[in-house]
């Protein structure tokens, strides 16, 4: 959620 990346949406 913080990173905004599709691969790591929860980071």
From Swiss-Prot:
Disulfide bonds: none annotated. Signal peptide: none annotated. GO terms for cellular component: extracellular region. It comes from the Eukaryota. It is found in: Secreted. The modification Leucine amide is found at residue 11. Its main location: secreted. Keywords: Amidation, Neuropeptide, Secreted. One of its GO terms (biological process) is neuropeptide signaling pathway. Mediates visceral muscle contractile activity (myotropic activity). Belongs to the periviscerokinin family. This is Periviscerokinin-2. It comes from Paramantis sacra.
């Amino acid at each position: 959620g913080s990173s905004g990346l599709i691969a790591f949406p929860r980071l």
